Every structure is written in C-alpha cells, then in structure tokens.
Amino acid sequence: MLIIRRHLCFSVSLIFMFLALPVEVSNALEDTKRNSTLITNVIIYDGSGDNPFKGSIEYSGELIVEVYRQEVESNGYQTIIDGEGLALAPGFIDTHSHHDLGIDEQPMAVAAVTQGITTIVRAVDGFSDSPPSKTSSSSRNDYFSIKEFKRYFSDIPVAINMASFSAHNSIRFRVMGDDFRRVSTNEEIEMMKRLVIEDMEEGAYGLSTGLEYDPGIHSSSEEVIRLTKAIAESVSYTHLTLPTNREV
C-alpha cells in the first residue's frame, strides 16, 4: 500500500507540475517581451542567400530572440519599431576598407555604421598605415605590425570589428628603408618572411600586396612568391588598379 501511495503521490505531483508549466512558460515569455524590442513590417535579408521576406524581429540587448515570418501580436513589448518600407540585414563586411585611418580619434566610425558596415578588413593595398595620433601624420613608411595594431587598439573601444592583412609594402619599407628601388636580396626576403609570419601568428587574415605602388612595384616575382608560399594556407590578396605589362 505504501508503494502505491508513493506512486499516487508522484503521479499527482506530475499532474500539478504539468498544469503549472504552461503558466510558468507564459510568464517567462511575457517577461522576455517586456524587456525586448520588436521590429515589425520589415523586409528581412537573413544572410543565407535566400530571397528576402517580410516579417518581424524581436531582440533584447545584443541578442536576437526570434525571427518571425508571420504577423506577430505586438502588445506587451518594451519598444515597437515599425519597419515599413525598410530593410533589415546582418552587418555588412567591408573587405577593402580604409575606415581604420583616424578611427582611433573617431571610434564611433559613423561613416561605416551608417552604411550598415559592422566589420572592416584593413591593411589592404599592401599598406598597414599607422594611425594619425600615433605619428605626426598617417605614414605608409611606418610599418604597423599586427601585434602593434592589437596593442594600440586594446584600450580604444571602437564601434566596428576590424580584421587585418599583413601588408607587403609596409614590410618592405621596414626591411629596405629608403633603398627600396631595387630587387631585394635573399637576406631581405627572409627578413620580410619573418615579419609576415609574425603577423600571421598574431592573427592576420593573409597577405596584401599593391604591386603598382612604391615600394612593391620594385619587388621581383620571386619575392612575392616566396612571401605567399610562407603563408600558403592563408589568403593572399592583391590590389590591381591599372592595366600593365607586368606578369600577374
């Protein structure tokens, strides 16, 4: 009889628990709504490549709570934004950006974020420019390594994400100085390789070149090939602007 009573008590407890569950879930959802913002009637590009659709998005703080493809009851939300006539998408990635120049002095990056850009890739064209406040003026001759870049911006909270290349031209300046209007020696190429590899170990996305600018225009094919081979498993990016007779 005792065993039966235990089963009976357990069964009754389960019944009460499941009866109470919808109420608790409902209360939790209401709490979420009270702390959330709902954007309604907006064209949504979800980043998957699928066709856009009209729907609503609920978010709280920095988190997207739910994406709705159907009409949503808007009562109870902390804030409601009518997105009629507007489009909503994940942040854009600017894969060739110069927004980093001056961003230490204007960390809100208004020119980028007002275009929907949330991530930039810097140190393109083979140059890793030093920020203006680090030198008297932005200098392409002053190589700004990835380690220096990370250290410099560690105490400067900026409004966008920044990825970076290792920059061939700036590295060539570092190694060869003003004597860059010639083919590099084997020793100089090895020094460049070490700097590129150090950048990669610090988180560089790949190697960028600008072979139509000083000093890269004076580099040999061997120099470029050896540097790219040193980081063969990463990305190599070259900026081509004008047609030339030079081999690519």
Language-model features and meaning:
Residues 2-12:
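Bacterial N-terminal signal peptides that target proteins for export
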Residues 11-20:
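Bacterial N-terminal signal peptides
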Residues 19-32:
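Bacterial Sec-dependent signal peptides at the C-terminal "C-region" and cleavage site
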Residues 29-35, 44, 48-91:
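Histidine-rich, glycine-flanked metal-binding segment
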Residues 86-87, 92-93, 97, 105-207, ...:
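Divalent-metal coordination cores built from histidine and acidic residues
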Residues 201-240:
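Divalent metal-binding pocket/active-site signature
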Residues 239, 244-248:
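Single conserved hydrophobic/aromatic residue that forms the stacking wall/gate
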